[in-house]
Amino acid sequence: MDVIKRHVDIAKREKYVFVPEIDKPTGQLMVCFDDGWAGIYEAKDFFIRNNIFPTIFVAVDLINSPGYLSLEQIKEMQSLGFRFEGHSWSHYDLTTYDDAGLLHEVKDSKDALSKMLGKEIKSICFPQGRFSDAVVRCCQDAGYLKLYSSISGGYYDLLGEKNLICRNLVQSVTDKQFKYIIDSKSSFFVKRTMKLHYQR
Protein backbone atom coordinates (compact mmCIF):
# COMPACT_ATOMS: atom_id res chain seq x y z
CA MET A 1 0.00 0.00 0.00
CA ASP A 2 2.89 2.39 0.58
CA VAL A 3 3.67 2.49 -3.14
CA ILE A 4 0.03 3.08 -4.04
CA LYS A 5 -0.28 5.89 -1.51
CA ARG A 6 2.83 7.60 -2.86
CA HIS A 7 1.58 7.30 -6.42
CA VAL A 8 -1.80 8.75 -5.46
CA ASP A 9 -0.09 11.68 -3.74
CA ILE A 10 2.07 12.34 -6.81
CA ALA A 11 -0.90 12.16 -9.17
CA LYS A 12 -2.94 14.57 -7.07
CA ARG A 13 -0.02 16.96 -6.74
CA GLU A 14 0.31 16.95 -10.53
CA LYS A 15 -3.44 17.71 -10.84
CA TYR A 16 -4.47 14.39 -12.38
CA VAL A 17 -8.05 13.21 -11.90
CA PHE A 18 -8.84 9.58 -11.11
CA VAL A 19 -11.72 8.29 -13.22
CA PRO A 20 -13.48 4.92 -13.61
CA GLU A 21 -12.80 5.06 -17.34
CA ILE A 22 -10.62 7.28 -19.51
CA ASP A 23 -12.55 9.59 -21.84
CA LYS A 24 -10.01 12.37 -22.41
CA PRO A 25 -6.54 12.25 -23.99
CA THR A 26 -4.84 13.94 -21.02
CA GLY A 27 -5.28 14.68 -17.34
CA GLN A 28 -6.97 11.44 -16.30
CA LEU A 29 -5.80 8.25 -14.61
CA MET A 30 -7.62 4.93 -14.44
CA VAL A 31 -6.51 2.49 -11.74
CA CYS A 32 -6.62 -1.24 -12.53
CA PHE A 33 -5.74 -4.35 -10.58
CA ASP A 34 -5.36 -7.83 -12.02
CA ASP A 35 -6.36 -11.16 -10.48
CA GLY A 36 -8.52 -9.96 -7.57
CA TRP A 37 -6.16 -10.34 -4.65
CA ALA A 38 -7.77 -10.18 -1.19
CA GLY A 39 -5.62 -7.18 -0.27
CA ILE A 40 -7.75 -4.98 -2.50
CA TYR A 41 -10.71 -5.54 -0.20
CA GLU A 42 -8.60 -4.63 2.81
CA ALA A 43 -7.58 -1.38 1.06
CA LYS A 44 -11.05 -0.43 -0.16
CA ASP A 45 -11.56 2.32 2.42
CA PHE A 46 -8.40 4.09 1.25
CA PHE A 47 -9.68 4.15 -2.32
CA ILE A 48 -13.13 5.34 -1.28
CA ARG A 49 -11.65 8.16 0.83
CA ASN A 50 -9.66 9.30 -2.19
CA ASN A 51 -12.61 8.95 -4.59
CA ILE A 52 -10.79 6.26 -6.55
CA PHE A 53 -12.83 3.34 -7.87
CA PRO A 54 -10.49 0.88 -9.59
CA THR A 55 -11.34 -1.66 -12.23
CA ILE A 56 -10.45 -5.13 -10.99
CA PHE A 57 -9.95 -7.90 -13.55
CA VAL A 58 -10.87 -11.26 -12.01
CA ALA A 59 -10.39 -14.81 -13.25
CA VAL A 60 -13.45 -16.95 -12.52
CA ASP A 61 -11.44 -19.86 -11.15
CA LEU A 62 -9.66 -17.65 -8.60
CA ILE A 63 -12.81 -16.26 -6.98
CA ASN A 64 -13.23 -17.65 -3.44
CA SER A 65 -9.71 -19.13 -3.54
CA PRO A 66 -7.34 -18.53 -0.60
CA GLY A 67 -5.69 -15.13 -0.93
CA TYR A 68 -8.25 -13.89 -3.46
CA LEU A 69 -11.52 -12.00 -3.23
CA SER A 70 -14.64 -13.95 -2.37
CA LEU A 71 -17.78 -13.50 -4.45
CA GLU A 72 -19.41 -11.84 -1.45
CA GLN A 73 -16.57 -9.30 -1.22
CA ILE A 74 -16.72 -8.66 -4.96
CA LYS A 75 -20.45 -7.96 -4.81
CA GLU A 76 -19.99 -5.65 -1.83
CA MET A 77 -17.24 -3.72 -3.59
CA GLN A 78 -19.27 -3.53 -6.78
CA SER A 79 -22.15 -1.98 -4.81
CA LEU A 80 -19.70 0.66 -3.54
CA GLY A 81 -18.62 1.65 -7.06
CA PHE A 82 -15.65 -0.62 -7.76
CA ARG A 83 -15.75 -2.11 -11.26
CA PHE A 84 -15.12 -5.74 -12.10
CA GLU A 85 -14.27 -7.11 -15.53
CA GLY A 86 -12.94 -10.32 -17.07
CA HIS A 87 -9.55 -11.97 -16.74
CA SER A 88 -10.35 -15.38 -18.32
CA TRP A 89 -11.41 -18.55 -16.54
CA SER A 90 -8.15 -20.08 -15.34
CA HIS A 91 -5.64 -17.21 -15.56
CA TYR A 92 -3.31 -19.07 -17.91
CA ASP A 93 -1.55 -17.71 -21.01
CA LEU A 94 -4.33 -17.48 -23.61
CA THR A 95 -1.91 -18.01 -26.50
CA THR A 96 -1.34 -21.63 -25.39
CA TYR A 97 -4.91 -22.88 -25.97
CA ASP A 98 -6.49 -24.57 -28.96
CA ASP A 99 -9.72 -23.08 -30.34
CA ALA A 100 -12.02 -24.94 -27.94
CA GLY A 101 -9.91 -24.16 -24.90
CA LEU A 102 -9.60 -20.50 -25.84
CA LEU A 103 -13.36 -20.20 -26.32
CA HIS A 104 -13.92 -21.63 -22.84
CA GLU A 105 -11.40 -19.27 -21.27
CA VAL A 106 -12.80 -16.21 -23.02
CA LYS A 107 -16.52 -16.77 -23.68
CA ASP A 108 -17.53 -19.13 -20.88
CA SER A 109 -15.76 -16.97 -18.31
CA LYS A 110 -17.54 -13.87 -19.64
CA ASP A 111 -20.93 -15.57 -19.36
CA ALA A 112 -20.21 -16.98 -15.89
CA LEU A 113 -18.91 -13.71 -14.45
CA SER A 114 -21.79 -11.75 -16.00
CA LYS A 115 -24.23 -14.11 -14.28
CA MET A 116 -22.38 -13.90 -10.94
CA LEU A 117 -22.34 -10.11 -10.91
CA GLY A 118 -25.69 -9.41 -12.55
CA LYS A 119 -24.18 -7.24 -15.26
CA GLU A 120 -22.64 -7.72 -18.67
CA ILE A 121 -18.87 -8.11 -18.66
CA LYS A 122 -17.61 -5.89 -21.48
CA SER A 123 -13.84 -5.83 -21.00
CA ILE A 124 -11.07 -8.37 -20.58
CA CYS A 125 -7.47 -8.09 -19.47
CA PHE A 126 -5.17 -10.74 -20.92
CA PRO A 127 -3.76 -13.04 -18.22
CA GLN A 128 0.00 -12.61 -17.91
CA GLY A 129 -0.36 -9.90 -20.56
CA ARG A 130 -0.03 -12.45 -23.36
CA PHE A 131 -2.15 -12.27 -26.52
CA SER A 132 -2.14 -13.05 -30.23
CA ASP A 133 -4.27 -12.27 -33.28
CA ALA A 134 -6.32 -15.41 -32.56
CA VAL A 135 -6.87 -14.30 -28.95
CA VAL A 136 -7.97 -10.85 -30.11
CA ARG A 137 -10.44 -12.33 -32.62
CA CYS A 138 -11.87 -14.71 -30.03
CA CYS A 139 -12.34 -11.89 -27.52
CA GLN A 140 -14.05 -9.71 -30.12
CA ASP A 141 -16.32 -12.57 -31.22
CA ALA A 142 -17.21 -13.20 -27.56
CA GLY A 143 -18.50 -9.63 -27.31
CA TYR A 144 -15.75 -7.87 -25.38
CA LEU A 145 -15.64 -4.19 -26.29
CA LYS A 146 -12.25 -3.40 -24.75
CA LEU A 147 -9.15 -5.58 -24.56
CA TYR A 148 -6.65 -4.44 -21.93
CA SER A 149 -3.02 -5.31 -22.60
CA SER A 150 0.13 -4.98 -20.52
CA ILE A 151 1.82 -2.92 -23.21
CA SER A 152 3.20 0.41 -22.03
CA GLY A 153 1.74 3.58 -23.44
CA GLY A 154 -1.12 6.03 -23.31
CA TYR A 155 -4.70 4.82 -23.12
CA TYR A 156 -5.36 5.65 -26.77
CA ASP A 157 -2.08 4.46 -28.24
CA LEU A 158 -3.40 1.08 -29.39
CA LEU A 159 -7.09 1.81 -29.71
CA GLY A 160 -8.14 0.96 -33.23
CA GLU A 161 -9.68 -1.91 -35.09
CA LYS A 162 -8.45 -4.36 -32.44
CA ASN A 163 -9.82 -2.31 -29.50
CA LEU A 164 -6.53 -2.84 -27.71
CA ILE A 165 -5.72 -0.62 -24.77
CA CYS A 166 -2.28 0.13 -23.34
CA ARG A 167 -1.67 -0.07 -19.61
CA ASN A 168 1.36 0.96 -17.64
CA LEU A 169 2.39 -1.47 -14.91
CA VAL A 170 3.60 0.78 -12.11
CA GLN A 171 3.76 -1.46 -9.04
CA SER A 172 7.55 -1.69 -9.23
CA VAL A 173 8.54 1.77 -10.46
CA THR A 174 10.15 4.59 -8.52
CA ASP A 175 8.32 7.83 -7.78
CA LYS A 176 10.35 9.57 -10.49
CA GLN A 177 9.51 6.86 -13.02
CA PHE A 178 5.84 7.04 -12.07
CA LYS A 179 5.71 10.76 -12.81
CA TYR A 180 7.50 10.15 -16.11
CA ILE A 181 4.88 7.53 -17.03
CA ILE A 182 1.79 9.55 -16.14
CA ASP A 183 3.18 12.51 -18.05
CA SER A 184 2.53 10.38 -21.17
CA LYS A 185 6.16 9.61 -21.85
CA SER A 186 5.80 5.84 -21.65
CA SER A 187 4.83 5.46 -25.31
CA PHE A 188 8.54 5.06 -25.95
CA PHE A 189 8.28 1.54 -24.49
CA VAL A 190 5.38 0.33 -26.68
CA LYS A 191 7.54 -1.58 -29.17
CA ARG A 192 9.62 -3.21 -26.46
CA THR A 193 6.67 -4.37 -24.39
CA MET A 194 4.82 -5.43 -27.54
CA LYS A 195 7.59 -7.95 -28.19
CA LEU A 196 7.16 -9.36 -24.68
CA HIS A 197 3.39 -9.78 -24.80
CA TYR A 198 2.22 -10.08 -28.40
CA GLN A 199 2.41 -13.23 -30.49
CA ARG A 200 1.04 -13.17 -34.05
Please provide the spans of the model-predicted regions.
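C-terminal active-site subregion of NodB/CE4 polysaccharide deacetylases
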Residues: 1-33, 37-40, 96-123, 129-200
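Acidic (Asp/Glu)-rich catalytic clusters
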Residues: 8-14, 43-52, 69-86, 140, ...
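A structural signal for isolated positions on well-ordered beta-strands in alpha/beta enzyme cores
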Residues: 30, 55, 83-85, 123
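Residue-level signal for pocket-adjacent positions within structured domains
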Residues: 58, 89, 160
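Short histidine/acidic/glycine/proline-rich micro-motifs that form metal-
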Residues: 60-65, 93, 128-130, 153
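Histidine/lysine/aspartate-rich catalytic loop segments that bind and position anionic ligands
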Residues: 62, 69-104
